Amino acid sequence: MAITVHCDIVSAEQEIFSGTVQSLVAAGSYGDLGIMPGHAPLLTTLQAGPVRVVKENGDEEVIFVSGGFLEVQPHRVTVLANTATRARDLDEEAALKAQEHAKELLANQKPDVDYTRATAELVEAMARLRTIQQFRNNK
């Protein structure tokens, strides 16, 4: 039997995952973070991207988070996400359209464009697509 830790992934709308896991990998502000049982206590921010959990039975689940916080305690890992969606529920076509729209806004050089918002939309669309790709690779 593998060594495990309890993990909760929640957003303002819902609890998306709660269970025992062998490990978790998330997109932290300074790069990917790998969390395993016995990890030192930690509180950090998360970037938009995939959170990959390896469940107690070895099955993997990929969840997209749009940012948030990751807290590690001795026997519990908590992801507090701005929004969270299971990778299998993501709409690739919508993410591709959002990415293209953001690229067009950034390329047009118009004075009424909010470049900060367009950049954030591009980053989130790319993170959604990266999550979809990671989900496909884990199948």
UniProtKB/Swiss-Prot annotation:
InterPro entries reported for this sequence: ATP_F1_dsu/esu_C_sf, ATP_synth_F1_dsu/esu, ATP_synth_F1_dsu/esu_N, ATP_synth_F1_esu_C, ATPsynth_dsu/esu_N
Chief subcellular location: membrane
Single GO molecular function: proton-transporting ATP synthase activity, rotational mechanism
Coiled-coil segments on the chain, per record: none
UniProt keywords, alphabetically: ATP synthesis, Cell inner membrane, Cell membrane, CF(1), Hydrogen ion transport, Ion transport, Membrane, Transport
Topological relation to the membrane, as annotated: Peripheral membrane protein
Localization of this protein: Cell inner membrane
A single Gene Ontology CC term: proton-transporting ATP synthase complex
Role of this protein: Produces ATP from ADP in the presence of a proton gradient across the membrane.
Family membership: Belongs to the ATPase epsilon chain family.
Subunit and interaction comment: F-type ATPases have 2 components, CF(1) - the catalytic core - and CF(0) - the membrane proton channel. CF(1) has five subunits: alpha(3), beta(3), gamma(1), delta(1), epsilon(1). CF(0) has three main subunits: a, b and c.
Name this polypeptide is given: ATP synthase epsilon chain
